[in-house]
Curated annotation (Swiss-Prot):
Pfam families: Arginosuc_syn_C (PF20979), Arginosuc_synth (PF00764). ATP binds at A10, Y11, S12, G13, G14, L15, D16, T17, S18, G117. Its EC number is 6.3.4.5. Pathway: Amino-acid biosynthesis; L-arginine biosynthesis; L-arginine from L-ornithine and carbamoyl phosphate: step 2/3. This is Argininosuccinate synthase. GO terms for biological process: argininosuccinate metabolic process; L-arginine biosynthetic process; urea cycle.
Amino acid sequence: MAEQKKVVLAYSGGLDTSVAIKWLQEQGYDVVACCLDVGEGKDLAFVQQKALEVGAVNSYVIDAKEEFAREYALISMQAHTMYEGKYPLVSALSRPLIAKKLVEVAEKENAVAVAHGCTGKGNDQVRFEVSIKSLNPDLEVIAPVREWQWSREEEIEYAASRGIPIPINLDSPYSIDQNLWGRANECGILEDPWAAPPEGAYDLTASLENTPDVPEIIEIAFEAGVPVSIDGVTYPLADLILKLNETAGKHGIGRIDHVENRLVGIKSREVYECPGAMTLITAHKELEDLTLVKEVAHFKPAIEQKLSEIIYNGLWFSPLKDALLAFLKETQKHVTGVVRVKLFKGHAIVEGRKSEYSLYDEKLATYTKDDAFDHHAAIGFIELWGLPTKVNSIVKKKEQIEA
């Protein structure tokens, strides 16, 4: 008897991907489940076992927290990637890593296809499929949820008829995605852009009414653009981000309410919580202000915006992203130092920064008797700097006289 074809499924443990296991089996595939730990806090042993109980022939759980932190979230922090000026790319960052691991498992298992649980109207289907095809063009990509187009009731009926456990939180109105870089929430009342997000939509952050009335001061140390310690205590990067999620989250930092333009052409209202990400981006930017020369500091935002768009639009494995990262890496060589941040009532306020590579010279900046700036040099500088506009004005006046 011929061996059945294998498909590797990105498995979350939820209803959609559990139903997908059975559905793919009925299409003639042996299903290999693959679940990544990118810091969402799931019971992964439970998820791994559930996949096997539903019918997967094998079930992988991969601890990818540190890889996600160092190879993906770190880039977001160093590039200050804020899609449309607001969103630090929480879900968009994890998709290429998940795709990479799916392809690795597929190649190990000699699978012919990879499957995901995305719908047909979201960004993630694009991110997954473009990434998978970039890494292995020979793999087929299957999107069961997009293909079957069932209502929720039809999906539950299918699950019940095949003995698939129905999650107890199925009546939650929200669709949530979480990793160590933050938490994304949509659907339910959030689909009304006029409706205020209920407090139940949040999990990582406290409401301003419930935040401490006393500020908390922390010091974050960076080495070559990488955050390495908080208040002198060194952490692996993934743990440092998770620690900041907890610390900044209790002060209500990192809540983002965003009506964004999706890649597929529609607008979507999303509520994000990114306490660690927003605190780190704020602190890192201040250290760059201290250590980057003016020309680099002024040009870098153009690179940041392009990187934000590329990552959001699912082009992580593109030549342009690689080229932009080469520039980014060069800018981080001297971003070393300590930033002091006050966490209070939803704000991460930088109160101090220092670096051995600081380009700030107090003797040049001061207005005291210690001033070392050559004020007389300004006369010639101003004359030369304004010369083009001066000449332009002379020519225009001459034209007016002749007219």
